[in-house]
């Protein structure tokens, strides 16, 4: 027998003792706060949790890269330890889930919309899979004492985290409480919220940690067991097919039940493995030689070597070749599964479904007979292996049981964006958790862009009293929703009675520095636009800067209280200057200060402090549009800086954002805003159907590439090609944004791309407020 395996069997050998209590079934002897458990004589185990990655929707090339990287991870496993890779299917606790996603009532006149939204969320939650998959790696090793074990796990943990990072997954260590919670949730399904464990208090009171996780009863029968009122069964993979698809593990875990699938891996040192295979090959060659000698003695000189002997020789040579030239390692492994159900009939039906799934892949599962307790302790991530149905595999063969499928997006206090097409689970994302929360919503006309944006706005207004929403609306699409949500619609045009003072400014405008310096930059840009887009000379810039400081002097001295100056005051300040250039500037801007286009030269007469503001710029003429865009963006910056001082978040939605990129100054201002707002607690969203046009602007291309959150709905063919290049989208992923219905597409969250579908019930008030379909508005 191979030395490594012999040593391992020796270490795992334990005296069998009939369990006297429920607690004694659990094979943990001692726990430490950092998550290391003693699970045998000098055998220590530690568990790491790793996140799923988008394997199922990746391109063939990406899948190959992930497969090879996962093979590297398996190759890097230490020979002296046993590694257990576990997939834990657990059902979300309904009550806990509802508390997390449902919007509490606020008695502010909007509760009827909250009730509607909650009904929609509950419908989606009921139709969803409601199964969450957690994935763990448990390393168990024999060491003399806890200090040696701790040093070992620190080194191994760093390696594991590095390998998972390269796969695009995040790996974290679990402490004692986190590990105990896994077992508690399995043993006590339905009581997930009741788990509470404090190591210090438990030690002080002399309680046993097993009391916090064990079920009320354990009953082990010939081919199943009972945990409390539930039934369970452990099965193991007995027969392996010659060829197994990489989707087998994912298909086995698709069953909508509480279950755990574990693969125990025992790597063998390459020198031992080569020696073992060479000995086997030598044995095969000896058998062939003996057979040939016997045939020769019988004068049968042309006899062909029997097929089975030839196969043994061929397979042994291939195995040896794998070990010596293809960087494969010999691994011993056993695959076990435990699944639970409410009734025995349901359990039998689930077992048959799992056996059928395995048969589809030409593999054969078998139920463990009279070994259910050992099987249960093997399948759960304790770090023990009590089932000896080991199979010899190479790294490549073992990597087929790849534990990755699809990434789930479920953030705390997030916004509902639809359902994951693959797992059918709800997508709840919180842009605050990303490196920058800026976003784009892209899609052809009719794909559901406005609806998606309105749904997000509605969610923010109804759920977060500490957040404000500002909309730039060039198509007058958002007014009904804004009015229904008690917001303010500001109509901006040359003839409108609504006015925004271009010179408005608060004390927080300067980001800690003198606000006038930053405002002076804005006035310079504004004057360049007012003069006709011509570049200002050095003299003109100096005059404008001097006049800006002069016109704000009294407002600054009054600590930014009272009435701010207007563009009319600014022009009067220009006229006071002696330089002829000042008179020229004053004359050039007269149309916009005292003439017919003076809407931005008057004091602000609208409520810019409402929680929900919509700037309606549909009637902004060609002459006023560049200036109007600048003034609106500056007004938004004013609000963002005010909110920052109050500790409030600001969400900005800009529909038809490509309009802003048609004017150099508004494009540059927007680019600066995009980069700066993250530190102000603000999040910008650009909405457009013209992706190709948008990407003609280098500024827009940079903004799109740097946005961490992108909602891609149905795309035109040219736009798809551009997006695929920019965001590295595979052909398979592209199919989710090709000729799909409204509200379907791809969601980019950080580095993840998740296919989603979002259907909102039509028989609701909210739907009527959000739809832009002709005949439904």
Give the positions of each predicted feature:
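Post-Walker A helix-loop "phosphate-sensing" segment adjacent to the P-loop in P-loop NTPases
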Residues: 459-470
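Conserved lysine of the Walker
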Residues: 449
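Extended, folded cores of ATP/NTP-driven motor/assembly subunits in large transport
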Residues: 1-404
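P-loop (Walker A) phosphate-binding loop of NTP-binding proteins
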Residues: 444
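Hydrophobic anchor at the beta1->P-loop junction of P-loop NTPases
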Residues: 441
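P-loop NTPase motor domains
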Residues: 53, 60-79, 90, 253, ...
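A short helix-turn-beta junction within AAA+ P-loop NTPase domains corresponding to the substrate/partner-engaging
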Residues: 486-490, 699-712
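Hydrophobic positions on the alpha1 helix immediately C-terminal to the Walker A/P-loop
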Residues: 452
């Amino acid at each position: 027998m191979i030395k490594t395996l012999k040593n391992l069997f020796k270490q795992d050998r334990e005296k069998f003792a009939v369990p006297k209590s429920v607690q004694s079934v659990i094979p943990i002897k001692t726990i430490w706060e950092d998550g290391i458990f003693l699970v045998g004589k000098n055998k220590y185990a530690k568990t790491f949790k790793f996140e799923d990655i988008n394997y199922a929707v990746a391109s063939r090339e990406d899948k190959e890269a992930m497969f090879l990287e996962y093979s590297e991870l398996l190759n890097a496993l230490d020979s002296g330890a046993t590694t257990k890779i576990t997939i834990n299917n657990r059902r979300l606790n309904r009550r806990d889930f509802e508390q997390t996603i449902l919007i509490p009532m606020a008695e502010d006149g909007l509760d009827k919309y909250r009730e509607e939204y909650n009904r929609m969320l509950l419908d989606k939650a009921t139709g969803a899979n409601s199964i969450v998959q957690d994935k763990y790696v448990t390393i168990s090793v024999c060491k003399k004492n806890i200090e040696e074990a701790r040093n070992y796990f620190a080194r191994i943990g760093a390696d594991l985290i590095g390998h998972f990072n390269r796969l695009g997954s995040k790996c974290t260590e679990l402490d004692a409480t986190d590990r105990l919670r896994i077992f508690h949730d399995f043993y006590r399904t339905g009581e997930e919220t009741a788990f509470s464990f404090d190591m210090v208090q438990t030690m002080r009171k002399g309680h046993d940690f097993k009391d916090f996780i064990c079920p009320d009863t354990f009953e082990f029968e010939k081919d199943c067991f009972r945990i409390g009122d539930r039934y369970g069964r452990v099965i193991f993979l007995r027969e392996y097919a010659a060829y197994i698809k990489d989707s087998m593990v994912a298909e086995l875990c698709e069953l909508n039940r509480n279950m755990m699938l574990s693969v125990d891996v025992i790597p063998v040192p390459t020198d031992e493995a080569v020696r073992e295979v060479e000995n086997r090959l030598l044995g095969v060659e000896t058998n062939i030689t003996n057979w040939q000698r016997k045939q020769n003695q019988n004068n049968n000189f042309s006899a062909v070597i029997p097929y089975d002997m030839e196969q043994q020789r061929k397979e042994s040579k291939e195995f040896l070749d794998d070990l010596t030239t293809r960087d494969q390692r010999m691994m011993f492994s056993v695959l076990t599964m435990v699944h639970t159900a409410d009734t025995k009939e349901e359990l039998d039906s689930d077992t048959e479904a799992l056996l059928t799934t395995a048969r589809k892949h030409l593999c054969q599962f078998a139920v463990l007979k009279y070994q259910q307790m050992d099987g249960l302790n093997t399948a759960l991530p304790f770090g023990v292996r009590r089932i000896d149905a080991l199979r010899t595999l190479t790294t490549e063969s073992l990597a087929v049981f790849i534990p990755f499928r699809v990434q789930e997006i479920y953030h705390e206090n997030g916004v509902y964006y639809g359902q994951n097409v693959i797992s059918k689970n709800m997508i709840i994302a919180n842009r605050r958790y990303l490196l920058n929360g800026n976003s784009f919503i892209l899609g052809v006309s009719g794909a559901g862009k406005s609806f998606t944006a309105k749904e997000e706005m509605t969610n923010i207004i109804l759920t977060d009293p500490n957040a404000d929403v500002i909309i730039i609306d060039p198509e007058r699409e958002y007014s009904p929703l804004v009015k229904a949500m008690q917001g303010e619609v500001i109509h901006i045009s040359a003839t409108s009675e609504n006015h925004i003072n271009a010179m408005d400014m608060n004390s927080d405008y300067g980001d800690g520095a003198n606000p006038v310096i930053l405002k002076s930059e804005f006035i310079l840009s504004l004057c360049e636009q007012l003069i006709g887009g011509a570049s200002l000379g050095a003299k003109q810039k100096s005059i404008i800067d001097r006049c800006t400081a002069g016109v704000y002097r009294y407002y600054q001295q009054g600590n930014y209280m009272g009435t701010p100056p207007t563009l009319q005051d600014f022009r009067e300040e220009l006229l006071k200057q002696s330089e002829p250039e000042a008179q020229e500037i004053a004359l050039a801007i007269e149309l916009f200060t005292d003439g017919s286009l003076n809407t931005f030269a008057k004091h602000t007469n609208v409520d810019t402090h409402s929680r929900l503001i919509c700037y309606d710029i549909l009637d902004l003429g060609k002459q006023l549009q560049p200036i109007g865009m600048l003034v609106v963006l500056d007004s938004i910056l004013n609000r963002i800086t005010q909110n920052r001082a109050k500790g409030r978040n600001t969400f900005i939605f800009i529909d038809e954002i490509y309009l802003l990129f048609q004017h150099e100054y508004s494009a540059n201002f927007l680019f600066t805003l995009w980069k700066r707002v993250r530190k102000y607690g603000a999040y910008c969203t650009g909405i457009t159907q013209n992706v190709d046009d948008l990407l003609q602007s280098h500024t827009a291309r940079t903004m799109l590439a740097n946005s961490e959150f992108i909602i891609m709905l149905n795309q035109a063919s040219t736009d798809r090609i551009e997006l695929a290049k920019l965001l590295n989208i595979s052909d398979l992923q592209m199919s989710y944004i090709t000729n799909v219905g409204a509200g379907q597409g791809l969601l980019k969250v950080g580095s993840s791309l998740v296919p989603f579908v979002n259907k909102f019930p039509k028989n609701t008030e909210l739907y009527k407020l959000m739809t832009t379909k002709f005949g439904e508005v």
